[in-house]
Curated annotation (Swiss-Prot):
<dbReference type="Pfam" id="PF00696">
    <property type="entry name" value="AA_kinase"/>
</dbReference>
<feature type="domain" description="PUA">
    <location>
        <begin position="280"/>
        <end position="358"/>
    </location>
</feature>
<keyword id="KW-0067">ATP-binding</keyword>
<feature type="binding site">
    <location>
        <position position="18"/>
    </location>
    <ligand>
        <name>ATP</name>
    </ligand>
</feature>
<dbReference type="InterPro" id="IPR005715">
    <property type="entry name" value="Glu_5kinase/COase_Synthase"/>
</dbReference>
<dbReference type="InterPro" id="IPR041739">
    <property type="entry name" value="G5K_ProB"/>
</dbReference>
<dbReference type="GO" id="GO:0003723">
    <property type="term" value="F:RNA binding"/>
</dbReference>
<feature type="binding site">
    <location>
        <begin position="218"/>
        <end position="224"/>
    </location>
    <ligand>
        <name>ATP</name>
    </ligand>
</feature>
<protein>
    <recommendedName>
        <fullName>Glutamate 5-kinase</fullName>
        <ecNumber>2.7.2.11</ecNumber>
    </recommendedName>
</protein>
<dbReference type="Pfam" id="PF01472">
    <property type="entry name" value="PUA"/>
</dbReference>
<dbReference type="GO" id="GO:0005829">
    <property type="term" value="C:cytosol"/>
</dbReference>
<dbReference type="GO" id="GO:0004349">
    <property type="term" value="F:glutamate 5-kinase activity"/>
</dbReference>
<dbReference type="InterPro" id="IPR036974">
    <property type="entry name" value="PUA_sf"/>
</dbReference>
<keyword id="KW-0963">Cytoplasm</keyword>
<dbReference type="GO" id="GO:0055129">
    <property type="term" value="P:L-proline biosynthetic process"/>
</dbReference>
<dbReference type="GO" id="GO:0005524">
    <property type="term" value="F:ATP binding"/>
</dbReference>
<keyword id="KW-0028">Amino-acid biosynthesis</keyword>
């Protein structure tokens, strides 16, 4: 009997497909519209079988290198953003032309980490992608490199694809790149590197050494593994497969490494708190509060707080840290930082009536 986790990929009715930069370029780094068209063929076959697909496509910077007369991928931010602004046009035009052969229309959705982090923008992006699918258009998502700052070096869209997968309620995430799957070491450097066909828990990752990205993109194995684990933890199974085998990956999931999803899908709010929202500050907890919050899933009371850091307001997301400064949870705080600074360490009975709510309610708290 085949793997039930691969079966989950194969039978998924809604899939996010992430296409990495190296899947869209020649070995010398030149953007290759022909390779993109081949991937579109494989994706079209899956859609023709009745699956909704959203594409997260890297490659804007790479697509802008040749038109701007650059000899290699730029290193400075301004030139990266200039290349992205030129390359994004070529990238979307190529996807549009590829799917036009099948009578399909594409829609471009450019996001930054900030868009995903802010609840209103997060919801707007979700509605846009849902409406594109309802109108039978193919959503092409990319990071908005022309306005991103440090995000432009952030995972070659690996993390973004995991966030989008949960955002649209996808049944599966397929990561396509030049990587065969997960190994316990770099197979290009170590002949005895062991291929890992399935990851069902932390024990499967013992001894795994993940490398960084290529000169063409920014998403190395570390980024892909982290993003796959993020999606799987949220309840979305993931297949990490080579773009050269896209047809097999999207047809029967017989290639690459599959990451098993947790049995219960994380709610949209808890996912946003845990993974998408930007932290506005932190609270340091004593040992008793850590046990209550993490071990017993109880609300955080002011009495268990020993330090307040950051300028945050009620409704913001903050990190909850143990006495050793290790983050143990994240949550939506009920008070401003200035209020909590006067409340911390005090029992509820000592506080005025209007300040007797938990600092972070259990319903707004997610252990990490």
């Amino acid at each position: 009997m085949g793997s039930p986790h691969r079966e989950a990929i194969r039978t998924a009715r809604s899939v996010v497909v992430k296409v990495g930069t190296t899947a869209l370029t020649t070995p010398s780094g030149v953007f290759d519209a022909g390779r993109l068209a081949e991937l579109a063929d494989a994706i079209e076959s899956r859609m023709k079988a009745g699956t909704d697909v959203v594409i997260v496509s890297s490659g804007a910077i790479a697509a802008g290198i040749e038109p701007l007369g650059l000899s290699r991928r730029p290193k400075d931010l301004a030139t990266k953003q200039a290349a992205a602004s030129v390359g994004q046009v070529a990238l979307v035009n190529s996807w549009s032309a590829a799917f036009a052969r099948y009578g399909r229309t594409v829609g471009q959705v450019l996001l930054t980490a900030h868009d995903i982090a802010m609840r209103v923008q997060h919801s707007n992006a979700q509605r846009t992608l849902d409406r594109l699918r309802a109108l039978h258009a193919v959503g092409i998502v990319n990071e908005n490199d022309t306005v991103a700052t440090n995000e432009i070096r952030f995972g070659d869209n690996d993390r973004l694809s995991a966030l989008v997968a949960h955002l649209v309620g996808a049944d599966a995430l397929v990561l396509l790149s030049d990587i065969d799957g997960l190994y316990d070491a770099d197979p290009g450097k170590f002949q005895n590197a062991r291929f890992i066909p399935e990851v069902s828990g932390p024990a499967d990752l013992d001894g795994v050494v993940a490398g960084q990205g290529s000169h063409l993109g920014t998403g190395g194995m570390a980024s892909k593994m982290s993003s796959a684990l993020l999606a799987a933890d949220a309840g979305v199974p993931v297949l990490l497969a080579p773009a050269a085998d896209a047809a097999a990956a999207l047809t029967d999931a017989s290639v690459g490494t599959v990451f098993a999803a947790r049995s219960e899908r994380m709610s949209a709010r808890r996912f946003w708190v845990r993974y998408a929202a930007e932290s506005a500050g932190s609270l340091t907890l004593d040992e008793g509060a850590v046990r209550a919050v993490v071990g017993h899933r109880r609300s955080l009371l002011p009495a268990g707080i020993t330090a307040v850091a950051g300028k945050f307001f009620g409704g913001d997301v903050v990190d909850l840290c143990g006495p050793d400064a290790t983050m143990v949870a994240r949550g939506v705080v009920a008070y401003d930082a200035t209020e909590l600074a006067t409340m911390m360490g005090r029992s509820t009975s000592e506080l005025p009536g209007e300040l007797r709510r938990p600092a972070v309610h259990a319903d707004d708290l997610v252990a990490v």
